[in-house]
Design a protein with these regions (language model features):
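Hydrophobic membrane-insertion alpha-helices, especially the h-region
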Residues: 34-47
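N-terminal Sec-pathway targeting helices
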Residues: 25-37
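Mid-length scaffold segments of soluble, non-membrane domains
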Residues: 124-174
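Extracytoplasmic low-complexity, Pro/Thr/Ser/Ala/Gly-rich segments
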Residues: 54-135
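Juxtamembrane cytosolic interface motif at the C-terminal end of transmembrane helices
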Residues: 46-54
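Helix-rich interaction surfaces within compact, conserved domain-sized segments
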Residues: 168-249
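Terminal targeting segments of Actinobacterial cell-envelope proteins
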Residues: 1-28
Length: 249
């Protein structure tokens, strides 16, 4: 082997060693990057879990501090009525387009025929100036919502408390953004004397196919004053998952 050949072979070995070293360094860098990414993902998961856990726990403490105590709210016991009317749409776009108002069996309604469209919006608190139609909100009840109705003569003065309750309740697992506060329309019937606030929910047990309704009921509770503790107890007793159409928006 000539000196030139030896030199070329040596250069080739050196070049190969350099390539191997660079490949090794590249593998190390990739392993470090992968490790950092994995660590960041774990940290993100931990932070997300902690945030969700804190979100779940915080409303439980806060809700009971809003408004008056349960004892001071002067609430009647929850009334449970046999329910019907699921899937019965009236008004525009239905087979009964001239029906613009439903005469409900209870005040406030907790079940019954309703307009074809529920209220689908990020807003959860309404005033007299922009209140949805009762018939739209009954459709929301069918989808698992709880509605807190308020007498406008008393509710307007307590809008700050109502907003705080709505914000906190919508973070509960029992509600998860299915809680609406809206003024009551006395044209649909007057609240009993001394009652200014009312909760209603349309519950149901689904059949094995998760589409048919095996049984259903309407639930109402009327109060003289607003109590976060009462609201929390009601929505946890009648959660969003108990409804004729719990998967509706």
């Amino acid at each position: 082997m000539t000196k030139k050949q030896v030199s070329q072979e040596r250069k080739a070995r050196v070049a190969q060693m350099q390539r191997q070293e660079k490949a090794r360094e590249r593998r190390i860098r990739l392993q470090i990057i992968a490790g950092c990414v994995a660590l960041l993902l774990v940290l993100a998961a931990v932070i997300t879990y902690a945030a969700i856990d804190a979100r779940k726990k915080q409303p439980d403490v806060a809700i009971s501090t809003f408004g008056v105590s349960a004892a001071a709210a002067a609430c009647s016991p929850v009334t449970t009525d046999p329910a019907k009317g699921n899937g019965v749409h009236v008004g525009h776009g239905t087979s009964t387009p001239t029906t613009t108002k439903v005469k409900y069996a209870t005040v406030p309604p907790s079940y019954g025929p309703h307009f074809a469209q529920p209220i689908v919006a990020d807003r959860k608190v309404y005033t007299a100036a922009d209140k949805p139609a009762i018939e739209n909100l009954v459709h929301n009840l069918e989808h698992g919502y709880t509605v807190l109705w308020y007498d406008q003569s008393a509710g307007e003065a307590k809008m700050d408390v109502l907003r705080k309750i709505a914000d906190a309740v919508n973070k509960l697992d029992a509600s998860k953004d299915k809680f609406i506060v809206s003024p009551w329309d006395p044209a649909y019937g007057a609240f009993p004397a001394g009652k200014k606030f009312a909760l209603s929910h349309w519950s149901a047990t689904l059949g094995a196919d998760k589409a048919s309704v095996a049984s259903q009921a309407g639930h109402r509770q009327l109060c003289g004053d607003i109590s976060g503790a009462v609201v929390k107890s009601f929505v946890e007793s009648y959660p969003r998952t108990s409804a004729p159409e719990p998967f509706g928006a």
